[in-house]
C-alpha cells in the first residue's frame, strides 16, 4: 500500500564504541522509512534534524539487534537483542527512545568495552528498560515473531524468540502495557 511504513534495523554498534549513542550514525539504531519513497517518515522523532541520517532514526542505543517483530493489532515493535556474554534483551521500541548501550561510556573508555550493561540506567537514567533479559548468561537470542491465530490456543498473541544456545524457543506472554508477564 502507498505510504505503508516499515522498520529497518541497522547492525549493532559495528564494534565502534561511540556509534550506538551517536544519532547521526546508523549503527545501533532502529530506522523507520517509507517503503515507496525510501524517505524517513514525517512523524519520526528526529525528522527536523539538520542531519539527513538522523531523520531516519526511530530509536538508538542498541547493541546487536537480531530479530524484529511487529505485534498484530497494535503495531508495537519488539526487538530481540543479542548481549555480549550476558543480558540478551527483548525491547519494546519507543519513538526517540535511548536503549542505553554505550561501550564507549560517554567517551570515558577508548574503543569498545563489551563489559558494560546492555541498558546502562546509571549512565542514562532515562534509557528505556528492557521488557525481558536473559540474566547472567546469554542465550544468543535471534529471530522474533508473534504467534497469531486460534490454532495457537492460549499462546495466541505470544511473542516467540529463538535462542541459538540450547536450540530453544522462548515464548513470552505480553501484558496489555507491553511488558512480559511472568
Summary of predicted features, one role per range:
Residues 3-181:
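Beta-propeller domain segments
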Amino acid at each position: 500500500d502507498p505510504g505503508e511504513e516499515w522498520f529497518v534495523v541497522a547492525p549493532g554498534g559495528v564494534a565502534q564504541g561511540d556509534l550506538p549513542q551517536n544519532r547521526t550514525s546508523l549503527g545501533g539504531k532502529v530506522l523507520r522509512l517509507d517503503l515507496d519513497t525510501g524517505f524517513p517518515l514525517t512523524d519520526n522523532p528526529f525528522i527536523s534534524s539538520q542531519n539527513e541520517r538522523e531523520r531516519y532514526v526511530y530509536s538508538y542505543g542498541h547493541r546487536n539487534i537480531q530479530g524484529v517483530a511487529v505485534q498484530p493489532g497494535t503495531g508495537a515493535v519488539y526487538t530481540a537483542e543479542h548481549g555480549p556474554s550476558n543480558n540478551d534483551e527483548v525491547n519494546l521500541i519507543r519513538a526517540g527512545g535511548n536503549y542505553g548501550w554505550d561501550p564507549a561510556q560517554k567517551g570515558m573508555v577508548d574503543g569498545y568495552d563489551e563489559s558494560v550493561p546492555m541498558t546502562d540506567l546509571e549512565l542514562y537514567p532515562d534509557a528505556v528498560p528492557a521488557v525481558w533479559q536473559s540474566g547472567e548468561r546469554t542465550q544468543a537470542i535471534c529471530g522474533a515473531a508473534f504467534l497469531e491465530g486460534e490454532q495457537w490456543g492460549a499462546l495466541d498473541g505470544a511473542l516467540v524468540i529463538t535462542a541459538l544456545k540450547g536450540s530453544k524457543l522462548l515464548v513470552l506472554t505480553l501484558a496489555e502495557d507491553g511488558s512480559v508477564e511472568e
